[in-house]
């Protein structure tokens, strides 16, 4: 685990009120997703995107309008396209797609291996399959019409691991002065983790008490 987990573990040894980090970081088979950025290199994939979105992905306007989930995907694959160009220096003819899978340890529907073992090209092939690209065209499009950079995120859903009261410390534990916890693994009432707002709220509570 990273230095952040080690820091929390060392602090937690001092007092039970400081939480139980091992509840969240001890089993990456239960807390990982895999994310990938697919960038189109020509026009060949775009018609399949347009058929689903009913929008031109290079219009500079809303494209998917949210996340598109492939409900029959063994990987539970989802994808989304934000307004293009997404990056300042992005080529106006290219489209950047965010693809991710929740089940990284099961074989895909087109690529018969787990997502976590796949190359960027293979992830692209699986995505194209769920876009409805004819199977005899998938390999060529993945090879020549897109580039894919995958990223494994081992703790992305650690926030949602089963827990009990006390596994997350209060922002300001009882008796603490000039010491606070902030971020996604602290307790704060009436809010839900996995948002920037949660981190900001806990930081505000830490400052203002």
Indicate where each model-derived feature is located.
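C-terminal segments that line or cap access tunnels to active or ligand-binding sites in enzymes
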Residues: 1-209
């Amino acid at each position: 685990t990273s230095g952040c987990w080690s820091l929390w573990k060392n602090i937690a040894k001092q007092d039970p009120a400081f939480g139980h980090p091992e509840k969240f970081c001890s089993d990456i088979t239960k807390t990982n997703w895999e994310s990938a950025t697919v960038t189109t290199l020509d026009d060949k994939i775009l018609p399949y995107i347009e058929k689903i979105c009913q929008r031109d992905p290079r219009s500079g306007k809303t494209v998917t309008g949210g996340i598109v989930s492939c409900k029959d995907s063994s990987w539970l694959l989802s994808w989304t396209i934000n307004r293009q160009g997404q990056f300042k220096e992005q080529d106006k003819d290219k489209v950047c797609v965010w693809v991710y899978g929740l089940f990284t340890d099961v074989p895909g529907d087109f690529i018969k291996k787990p997502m976590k073992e796949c190359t960027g090209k293979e992830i692209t092939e699986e995505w194209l399959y769920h876009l409805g690209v004819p199977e005899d065209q998938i390999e060529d499009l993945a090879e020549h019409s897109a580039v894919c950079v995958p990223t494994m995120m081992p703790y992305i859903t650690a926030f949602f691991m089963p827990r009990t009261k006390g596994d997350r410390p209060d922002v300001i534990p009882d008796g603490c002065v000039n010491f606070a916890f902030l971020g996604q693994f602290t307790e704060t009432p009436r809010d839900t983790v996995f948002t920037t707002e949660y981190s900001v709220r806990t930081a505000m509570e830490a400052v203002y008490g």
